[in-house]
Amino acid sequence: MAGTRRKSLQNRQVGSLLIFLCISVGGATTIRYSVAEEMESGSFVANVAKDLGLEVGKLAARGARLVSEGNKMHFRLHRKTGDLFVKEKLDRESLCGKADPCVLHFEVVLVEPLQSFRAEVRVFDINDNAPVFLNKEPLLKIPESTPLGSRFPLQSAQDLDVGLNGLQNYTLSANGYFHLHTRFRSHGPKYAELVLNKPLDREKQPEVNLTITAVDGGSPPKSGTAHIHVVVLDVNDHVPQFSRLVYRAQVSENSPNGSLVATVTAVDLDEGTNKAITYSLAQNPEAILKTFQIDPQNGEVRLRGPLDFEAIETYDIDIQATDGGGLSAHSKVLVEVVDVNDNPPEVMVSSVSSPLPEDSPPQTVVALFTIRDRDIRVGGKVTCFLREDLPFVIKPTFGNSYSLVTDRSLDREEVSGYNITLVAMDTGPPSLSAETMIEVLISDVNDNPPIFREDSYILTVRENNSPAVFIGKVHAEDLDLGENAQITYSLLPPKNGDLSVFAYISINSDNGKLYALRTMDYEAIQDFQFVVKATDGGFLSLSSQVTVRVVVLDDNDNRPMILYPLQNGTLPCNDLVPRSAEAGYLVTKVVAVDGDSGQNSWLSYHLLKATDLGLFSVQRQNGEIHTLRQISERDPMMQKLIILVQDHGQPALSTTVSLNILLVDGFSEPYLQFQDPTRHSRKVNPSTKYLVISLVILSFLFLLSVIVIFIIHVYQKIKYREKFTIQEHFYDDCNFSNNLVQGQGNGSLSRPCPYEMCSATGTGNSEFRFLKRFMPNFPFPHATGEIKMEAGSSLPPNSDRNKSQRLEGHDQVSDDYM
């Protein structure tokens, strides 16, 4: 037996390597594969990328993943290669039980954009389970008078495999009394019956031991055995008789435990203990024994466990009635499970795209989900809808799969996220529903430019301000988030292109605060305007502009300026008034202006002082000076007035002007500027005399020093001339640099000669000392050597006399520069 199992395992491993892959596309959206069970973890199934017609690199780029309809995924996808592998060993019996075919459903989900493909893997059964008898040693009591051909049903063997690998046949060990007959159930495994071939004789053989073997159809086949112990009973003439050979019943799947299913009845014509009948479910599969029970006395069959129409629709129950003498009879109860709408629909979300950009176009896939209703036969059609009015709609994709897509434009600034409730409802009765909530966040895109709070700004700054003084702030808001809402401020020149505004103002790029760069002067500029640009930090930045006007406020920083009468800084202006002038005579008018503006430039005129305050008056508003009365002979000829001109600033600034008014008899006499006679009558101050004497003495000493220095200088010059001789030739034409001193003689020489000169600084005189000629004397072939003398005569060249005269001419040039 161990060798057989080892060989079977080897064959199974070989079969795992030679997997038959059946690939098809259902409705162009479903891919199907077939694999054998018991494949080891990591076994290759198929290449999904190839079957879907996708490039291998796109699986990883689009975040491909597998989503199972159940709670567990049995496969894994290699994103780089597109290969599909078994995640763990597959056991068809634990996955699907007796269901055939065994199909595992999952989806291949891709994102960016969201897309899904339905896939199915059919798990083929291998013969990895042997038939098993639950009761290894069943006991049968058969009366010796049992007629030939009597049948005795045996407990069926259980084989978890399906199809050919499941239970196929029974065999019985060789004996002289019984042979075996295999029977079929409409729903359930095959079972065997013992058929009596030879009459029993308790006196000859009170017991018979048999071995029954259950065999499946695998290759190689597997089997299981049970040992039957037959006890031959003494004669019991009558066996129990059921009222029906087959009982039929219908039970709703939602019936509670203990519900009555059916009542079987059997009678026995014997008397005494042989007439007492006991009912049992001895020869039934384990699933029936867990679900039903029978009262041994009255034959009532009741529910022991829950029913599930979606799992098992009908039950075939074998009922055994045994009398007191050991004789038994069998009957069947066929139970049909009635489906009720007891399962609400299930909503299974396989993928959600969140966050979702707010600029996503309509029909963008947001989520993928499937709906399953186990009561689809009675529940009717399942509908799916959204509980609220949201910018999303549900679209069917294939089968029971759906996608949630956008229905209209999204705006994160209005709604930053959605809690979407998916409702699935069947038609009942009664109608059942299920809800699943999907949270979808809306991500921001830069679709809102900065917006200034004001259409335009007017700011004020007072003149004479300190540099870098804060004068105001502009503020813009951006409805976006993150970097898309980070605003940077900058200055733009006004529309007229005047860039000088940048010399007056600066802006903090982070907060929009404006500062004055320099001190403002209202008299130079009264206002100016510029443009502030606000730019957000988005990848494709957006901006907006606003005009800012800065008004300079005037300060009273300018005193009134007198335009008339003109002031020469020493003497006041004189005006002539005839002595014949009457009261109200216009003498003159003081004209003044103020560089400020507004109230600071309003001027008023006041008579501050006067020789005779009762003789003249000043108009407060216009500065006109009039006589208050007629001039008399007693009035002094010189009238001195001091006029105060004052502005209206806070504090007020003022300027005074002095006027001399001469009272004359008429304007026909020539008039010289009148000097104040009191000056001649003033006495000379003794200190002034001493000052004048000191100045005279100092001047004399200075002149004497100059004469002495000049004599010494002439003497040194004569000594210096005796040490050098003059070269015979001079340059005809010479060009020298600008730092050389050129001297032109006053008639003694016809052309200048350059020399280096040195000035003795700090000596208090203007002495120049000629050290040497700047350039050597080279003879020129065309030099004439002719020098004009003071008397205008000329001598032949190269004569001694000419040489001496040239020397004198050279000294004359030096004297000219001295």
Curated annotation (Swiss-Prot):
Q: Which Cys residues form disulphide pairs?
A: none
Q: Which domain of life is it from?
A: Eukaryota
Leader sequence range is 1-28
- Where would you find the membrane-spanning parts of this chain? 692-712
Q: Which PROSITE patterns match?
A: CADHERIN_1, CADHERIN_2
Annotated region (Disordered) at: 789-818
Cite the ranges annotated as topological domain Cytoplasmic: 713-818
For this UniProt entry, the molecular function terms from Gene Ontology, in alphabetical order, are: calcium ion binding
Annotated compartments: Cell membrane
The Cadherin domain covers: 35-133, 138-242, 243-347, 348-452, 457-562, 577-672
Q: Where is this chain compositionally biased, Basic and acidic residues type?
A: 800-818
Q: Which UniProt keywords apply?
A: Calcium, Cell adhesion, Cell membrane, Glycoprotein, Membrane, Repeat, Signal, Transmembrane, Transmembrane helix
Its membrane topology, per UniProt? Answer: Single-pass type I membrane protein
Keyword flag Repeat:
yes
Q: Which residues lie on this side of the membrane: Extracellular?
A: 29-691
This entry carries the following GO cellular component terms, namely:
plasma membrane
What GO terms describe the biological role, i.e. biological process, of this protein?
Answer: cell adhesion; homophilic cell adhesion via plasma membrane adhesion molecules; nervous system development
Give me the glycosylation sites of this protein: N169, N209, N257, N419, N568
Q: What's the stated role of this polypeptide?
A: Potential calcium-dependent cell-adhesion protein. May be involved in the establishment and maintenance of specific neuronal connections in the brain.
Task: Report what the protein is called.
Answer: Protocadherin beta-1
Give the organism, scientific name: Pan troglodytes
Tell me the classification of the organism that encodes this protein: Eukaryota, Metazoa, Chordata, Craniata, Vertebrata
Q: What gene is this protein a product of? A: PCDHB1
